[in-house]
Amino acid sequence: MKILIKNTKIIDSSSSHNNKVCDILINNNKIEKIAKSIQIDTKTKVYKQDNLHISQGWFDMHVNFGQPGYEHRETIENGLNAAAKGGFTDVLLMPNTNPSIDNSTMIDFVKNITKNKIINVHVAGTLSQSQKGENLVEIYDMIKNGCIAFTDDKKSIQSTELMKIALLYIKNTSALLMNFPNDKSVQKKGVINEGITSTQLGLKGIPAIAEEIMLDRDIALCRYTESRIHESYLSTRKSIQKIKNAKDEGIKISADVALHNIFLTDSSTNNFDTRFKVLPPFRTENDNKAIIQGLKDGIIDVISCDHNPIEIESKKLEFDNAKFGIIGLESAFGLIIINLEKHLSLNQIIDKISNNPRKILGIKNTSIEEGNIANLTIFNPETKWIFEKKDIISKSKNTPFVGEKLKGKALALVNNNKFVEL
């Protein structure tokens, strides 16, 4: 494949061409030349649009594709198409399948389905066998087979002893240990944020301390073991402060926030719409302000979609009985720009969805430089559009954002010697 991308602004904080408008020539999966103007032969494909921007391929650290076991929610093929539509060239697949991804055979299953695609699928295995929180998986064996991270995701590791052992095991490996801080003994049967809204609606609340207590535990264990950890889906003001304090202390810790937890609050649930039922729940405006400041200050490293397809039968229920979850890949960038452009620079935003996930996961940087592999997302951050049902590629449709006015859109992907216009 040979293609020239004309007059595109490079947004890549790791590149010497950052913020420059250039032509980029891609040949045989590599960036062959970057210059103000490049002359080519008539056989080379040319891609040009108004206000083109280009970055390292976008990377989402939390996707659920359902297969195997939950194909009625999402297949891997569906999920990959949704990721591409949203502008993502890389995803980290969560192990929430049936059976769960807790052994090398399951890793092989995913690798066989996802090979030779334009999207790179990286595998996160469970930390405990069958996500039961009792016994560790065969960590070294799974790493040898390509597993790059371990997490029980929304089930969280409740056992302090198991988490301590896991941190010690993983300490001298290249893999990342991830945990969603949520003490289930505190959450109990809570379904939305504990506060005024939960009281008014008569719904059981999830206190902020359910997150904060476990975060304190994880930080203490990280300090004790001198290992490293990534905390997922942070949602409270105090959690952001705890991450800041831990980083200032020199503890090896990183963190992400789910996109929807940045700008929605618990008042979204006032009409009992289960499309707004997520875990962690939407918190308060003060929490959201702290999250935005945390993103701005670099305390929160990554923005993720937390793409979690749920079948309609499990959403069209009473709020207490409906499943947690929301899809997000297709609408992610438009929501990020429209909600964060006044707070973060475009370079900061792209770092959160591209450079930083790779850095945290230990994946080779694909900086936009001559000679490097071409893994790129082409986009226009100024495109205004309305998210419609036809834009949903996912098999499940559990999103509250249909009809929303968005800003910013992916236009094309370059990866694995393939070029796709979106």
Task: Explain the meaning of each model-derived region.
Residues 8, 318-321, 373-422:
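C-terminal cap of metal-dependent C-N hydrolases
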Residues 137-303:
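Histidine/acidic residue-rich metal-binding segments in metalloenzymes
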Residues 200-226, 296-297, 302-303, 308-381:
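His/Asp/Glu-enriched, well-ordered alpha-helical/loop segment
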Residues 1-40, 418:
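N-terminal metal-binding scaffold of metallo-dependent hydrolase/deaminase domains
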Residues 8, 24, 29, 51, ...:
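Divalent metal-coordination and catalytic microenvironments
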Residues 52-114:
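Metal-associated gating/positioning segment near the N- to mid-region
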Residues 38-54:
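Active-site metal-binding motif and surrounding structural segment of the metallo-beta-lactamase
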Residues 61-74, 122-135, 204-208:
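Active-site mouth loops of central-metabolism enzymes
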